[in-house]
Amino acid sequence: HTRPELMDGQNVAAHTWRTVVILHTLWPDVSKNCLLNMLYHDVAEAETGDMPATTKWRYPELNELMARVERDYENSIGVGDTVYKVTDDERAMCDIADKLELVFHCYRLMQQGNTLANDVFLKGVGYLQEKYLEKEFFEPVKEILNALTSEYHKPPRLQVTLEQFSNL
């Protein structure tokens, strides 16, 4: 994650491992190519750098250009879509796993008191719901997002404790 306030020591290897675990946990029957696609999904960042997801969301035309540059680089080193072909649904599942890992990461930061993660958390949830809500394979993700967002809207435990003390 490229925003310094959200990094918390996470690197591309840790992010990638988590995305592969999320992908395989949610959809254990995905193809080997899909798993390999997920494994290599951020390898181009070694060449291009990593643009924050929020910037990609804000500037779709820049996102399209970066996607093309990354795709060209991946294909030049033999790890791109031309090598590991995936279906449109599998590509969507990889995107979901990638964004869900971001949501989980931000959720953990928020639990630690990092309020700077709130905006990215909510944008990540919104992105997933807006783009994939109608897809049948999105069902398990809906449950996860519902659980995370219902927990997000609860007041922090410290706030509840202080309110209980003030009522004594």
Language-model features: where?
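Alpha-helical, largely C-terminal catalytic domains
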Residues: 1-168
